[in-house]
Structures are given as structure tokens and as C-alpha cells.
UniProtKB/Swiss-Prot annotation:
Keyword Iron-sulfur: yes
Catalysed reactions, as listed in the record: (2R,3S)-3-isopropylmalate = (2S)-2-isopropylmalate
CDD domains with a match to the protein in the record: IPMI
Entry keywords, A to Z: 4Fe-4S, Amino-acid biosynthesis, Branched-chain amino acid biosynthesis, Iron, Iron-sulfur, Leucine biosynthesis, Lyase, Metal-binding
Protein's name according to its UniProt entry: 3-isopropylmalate dehydratase large subunit
Any Gene Ontology biological process: L-leucine biosynthetic process
Length: 469
């Protein structure tokens, strides 16, 4: 049998029908649903007189619009409230494998709760009406975001029409330096590839530095794959994967567990398999990263400087840098460490898991929020993460430092609730996108790791977190 990449194994095992032009009908194992992209899909089903094909594939929660404070007040914005109430009505009507509504103790970001309850299992195809579904590729799943019309299609048929992607291996070998995390790897990769470098590809992340990461770190890497333009991000199964899933509520039990593990261990790229493209990075050379512009590819090391467009020969790229600098209110050649921070956001489906909160707390412990920093939001990714963090006393560390400890949700990542920036404010954010207006109209987002965000919070500007040790 011809050697296959991990992506090729996942793809071929889910093809229901193959067209001559390469388009295939792919079976979907897990359908994640939230309140923003599902109402129209459910309405379309009703208008067509259809019912969901397999409700046992559905895991649903409210996350984008839910407030992260004063839950007793409910959802004040009428549009947000309507979306959450519509999700609730739809799921209660049709059913689901798991549903965590607003105020449920397990409610949280869909890409956090899926893995933590064992709804995300190796070998699955996973879709959601959300760009960062690629997160689940950390479990050797073929996972990607879909549009609202595709949400309806999956509900109705449990299948999707797809074009096969090309394959790319991003190999990161070596040992990460102190203070450097998975988020820094992800940003360094995007800085290398650009936001279009992965277009048309499914990226497998490999190498000794990736294998050394926890599942939380691998989820961060795969979460950001979409920001390099990739269709999906993947990491092969190893003992770290298996240990993480053991005893999760929805993971197989008993003999079924042993059978599942035997299959999961095959979910890796075969020796001799060919990738369409290979990119290599040296982990030891990766430093803490900070984005300075309005795209994740506009990234520098914390010891670097904002670029000078005058030195850029390509007129299109030069114009893009000029526009970004104008929006961000930055002068060319400004040292990254001199960029002031007005707000800090520690959260999102990229960096809101327990390991991320521990990382931030280790920096915040014994320190206080800088007077110039208006607000620091710490938003756990789920109710279970919040409970564990509180059991470890992490919330007390944050509160003692003057940070705000919030309820779970998407929060300031995309400002669909009340958590947002004011025009002109700079934010050190552990989220995944720094587009214009992403965290509020006129807000200026800088993407960083949890440790770097906490460091900026206590100093008032960006600083190499290694200097605070």
C-alpha cells in the first residue's frame, strides 16, 4: 500500500462519493454548533420540512454573545439575546449529544469544551460554523470551519462537498527557549508563511518541538493554522494525545477504549509519504512574538522594531504597511518594547485553557497591574477551566494583581458582547486575529502569548517576559 500522510488517511476514510473532477462528498462525524451561525441553518431546515440527520453528532453551546460578567442580568443586547434564545429553542427541539446553554456550569467556547469533554476524538471529521474549528486538528482530526449554508447541509445530510487540499509539513525541531510558548511558535510560522502561504493546504505540524507540546499547546498551534491561510491544521496522535483523552466523559470506555487507542495509533504520516511542501523552523531561534499591524503576518520579535515602509520595494506591500501603521498609530522603526498597552485580554479559543491561565498567573504572581493599563480581562475558556483554575487558586493571583476574573465565553476576541476596546486603544491580546476593528471599532490589537500579555499588563508596555523572571 502506498505511504500516506495523516491528511490523506483522514480524507480517504471519509469519502462517501468521489467525482471525476476531484470533488468529494465527505462524511462528517462531529458537528459543533453555536448561536451565531446556526439560526439561519435551522430555519432553512424547517422551511424545507427536514430534520437533522444525526443529532448524536451535535455538540452545542452559547459562546460568542454571552456576557462574561453579571450573569444575573442576563444578555442585555436584544440581538445577542435573540441569537442565544434561538439556539436554545432549536437544540431543545431537535436534541444533541451535548448542549451547554448560557449559565450552565460547563458552558464555554465551543473549541474548548469539545476537547475537554472528549467530544473531539482522533480520526474524526469535525466542522463548525466558525473559522477556528482547525483547533481540533490537534487530535489528528480533519477539522475546519464552514459557512451557514454548509451548517444547514451538514444538519440535513451529515455530509459536505469538499475539494481535496494539498499537503504541507511544518516541522519545528529543537528545544524552545525559556519564556517561549506555543503561541510564539504559531506567530513565528505565520510570519514565515504569510497569511496566504497556507492557502489550499492542510498543514501537518511535526518535529520534536511540536511533540514536546501539551495538548493545550497543540490546540493553540492548530487554532492559528487558519491565520496562515490553511484549510486545516493537524498533529499526529502520540501518547500525549491518548493520556489527555483518557477518562474524558465522552471518550470510549473499557474494551472500546482499547480498540480506539489501537486505531488512533495509526493516525500518523507513514514513513516515505510525500508532502507537497515542507517548511522547517528551528525552535531554539524562536523568540517571544508581538504583532504590530492589522494582520497576523505583521509580527516581530519583542526585541525588534516596527518596519519602515520606506525600505520596502514592493509598492503593494509598502502601501499595506503604511495603512497598518496609520491605523495602529505607530511610527516606523518604533521599538516593539515601547508600544504602550491600554487594555489586556487573556482568553479566546486560542489561549484560554488551564495551561494558558497558569502561564499568565506565573507572571502576574506578586505583581500588580500597571497604573497606565485601564483594564485586564482574564476570561477562562469554559466553566470547567474556570473551576479548575479556582481550585488551583489562580483567580486569587489575578485578582490580587488587579486583573478582572470573568465568566467563560469568547469575550473581547471579537467584541460581540460588552467586552471591547475604545477607539485608539492598544490591547495585548492572546486571541487570534488583529484585523481593523476586531476588538471594537478603532481598537488596536497586538497578538501575544499569555505570558507576554501578563507581562505587558504589569509593566504597561510590551516587554520580553524573560526580563521579569
Amino acid at each position: 500500500m502506498e505511504a500516506q500522510t495523516l491528511y490523506e488517511k483522514l480524507w480517504s476514510s471519509h469519502v462517501v462519493h468521489q467525482e471525476a473532477d476531484g470533488t468529494a462528498l465527505i462524511y462528517i462525524d462531529r458537528h459543533l454548533i453555536h448561536e451565531v451561525t446556526s439560526p439561519q441553518a435551522f430555519e432553512g431546515l424547517k422551511l424545507a420540512g427536514r430534520k437533522p440527520w444525526r443529532v448524536s453528532s451535535i455538540v452545542a453551546t452559547a459562546d460568542h454573545n454571552t456576557p462574561t460578567d453579571h450573569w444575573e442580568r442576563g444578555i442585555l443586547d436584544p440581538v445577542s439575546r435573540q441569537q442565544v434564545e434561538t439556539l436554545d429553542a432549536n437544540i431543545r427541539e431537535v436534541g444533541a449529544l451535548a448542549y451547554f446553554p448560557f449559565r450552565d456550569a460547563r458552558q464555554g467556547i465551543v473549541h474548548v469544551i469539545g476537547p475537554e469533554i472528549g467530544a473531539t476524538l482522533p480520526g474524526m471529521t469535525v466542522v463548525c460554523g466558525d473559522s477556528h474549528t482547525s483547533t481540533h486538528g490537534a487530535f489528528a482530526c480533519l477539522a475546519h470551519g464552514i459557512g451557514t449554508s454548509e451548517v444547514e447541509h451538514v444538519l440535513a445530510t451529515q455530509c459536505l462537498l469538499q475539494k481535496r487540499s494539498k499537503t504541507m509539513l511544518v516541522r519545528v525541531d529543537g528545544e524552545l527557549g525559556r519564556g517561549v510558548s506555543a503561541k510564539d511558535i504559531a506567530l513565528a510560522i505565520i510570519g514565515r508563511l504569510g497569511t496566504a502561504g497556507g492557502t489550499g493546504y492542510a498543514i501537518e505540524f511535526g518535529g520534536s518541538a511540536i511533540r514536546a507540546l501539551s495538548m493545550e499547546g497543540r490546540m493553540t498551534i492548530c487554532n492559528m493554522a487558519i491565520e496562515a491561510g490553511a484549510r486545516a491544521g493537524l498533529v499526529a496522535v502520540d501518547q500525549t494525545t491518548i493520556d489527555y483523552l483518557r477518562d474524558k466523559p465522552l471518550a470510549p470506555k473499557g474494551q472500546a477504549w482499547e480498540q480506539a487507542v489501537a486505531y488512533w495509533r495509526t493516525l500518523k504520516t507513514d514513513d516515505g509519504a510525500k508532502f507537497d511542501k515542507i517548511v522547517e523552523l528551528d525552535a531554539a531561534q524562536i523568540q517571544p512574538q508581538v504583532t504590530w499591524g492589522t494582520s497576523p503576518e505583521m509580527v516581530e520579535t519583542v526585541s525588534g522594531r516596527v518596519p519602515d515602509p520606506a525600505g520596502i520595494g514592493d509598492p503593494v506591500r509598502r502601501e499595506g504597511i503604511e495603512r497598518a501603521l496609520k491605523y495602529m498609530g505607530l511610527a516606523p522603526n518604533t521599538p516593539i518594547s515601547e508600544i504602550p498597552v491600554d487594555q489586556v485580554f487573556i482568553g479566546s479559543c486560542t489561549n484560554s485553557r488551564i495551561e494558558d491561565l497558569r502561564e499568565a498567573a506565573s507572571v502576574a504572581k506578586g505583581r500588580s497591574k500597571a497604573p497606565s493599563v485601564k483594564r485586564v480581562l482574564v476570561v477562562p475558556g469554559s466553566g470547567l477551566v474556570k473551576r479548575q483554575a479556582e481550585a488551583e487558586g489562580l483567580h486569587e493571583v489575578f485578582l490580587a494583581a488587579g486583573f478582572e476574573w470573568r465568566e467563560p465565553g469568547c469575550s473581547m476576541c471579537l467584541a460581540m458582547n460588552a467586552d471591547r476596546l475604545e477607539p485608539g486603544e492598544h490591547c495585548a491580546s492572546t486571541s487570534n486575529r488583529n484585523f481593523e476593528g476586531r476588538q471594537g471599532a478603532g481598537g488596536r490589537t497586538h497578538l501575544v502569548s499569555p505570558a507576554m500579555a501578563a507581562a505587558a499588563a504589569v509593566v504597561g508596555h510590551f516587554i520580553d517576559v524573560r526580563e521579569l523572571a
